[in-house]
Curated annotation (Swiss-Prot):
This is Ig heavy chain V region HPCG13. InterPro entries: Ig-like_dom, Ig-like_dom_sf, Ig-like_fold, Ig_sub, Ig_V-set, IgHV. This chain was isolated from a myeloma protein that binds phosphorylcholine. One of its GO terms (biological process) is immunoglobulin mediated immune response. It comes from Mus musculus (Mouse).
């Protein structure tokens, strides 16, 4: 069974840091592109970070809203994807999801999602 399980969320003050984890199972993490997506309190989904697969040396990409503050990485030996979040702001408050990328025909899509972990940034 393919599973993604996020953890590491919580309450943090503005300017603080958190590291989210996404434990993966049922597939080989190094073979897949992986993504982080968040859902704001207004229910808007926002893509924030990508980690490409081993073929592309696990290179990363970020949305403008988090670039320079968030870092995505992975530990393939433990099958865990990470999101290091620094200089957190109130607008980073959201439910954070990891997702696996899949390719079908000419379309990329997220075929597996975790249940999410909640991050609240407030003083």
């Amino acid at each position: 069974e393919v599973k993604l399980v996020e953890s590491g969320g919580g309450l943090v003050q503005p300017g603080g840091s958190l590291r989210l984890s996404c434990a993966t199972s049922g597939f080989t993490l190094s073979d897949f592109y992986m993504e982080w997506v968040r859902q704001t309190p207004g229910k808007r989904l926002e893509w924030i970070a990508a980690s490409r697969n081993k073929v592309y040396d696990y290179t990363t990409e970020y949305s403008a809203s988090v670039k320079g503050r968030f870092i995505v990485s992975r530990d393939t030996s433990q099958s865990i994807l990470y999101l290091q979040m620094n200089a957190l702001r109130a607008e980073d408050t959201a439910i954070y999801y990891c997702a696996r990328d899949a390719y079908y025909g000419s379309y990329w899509y997220f075929d597996v999602w975790g249940a999410g972990t909640t991050v609240t940034v407030s003083s």
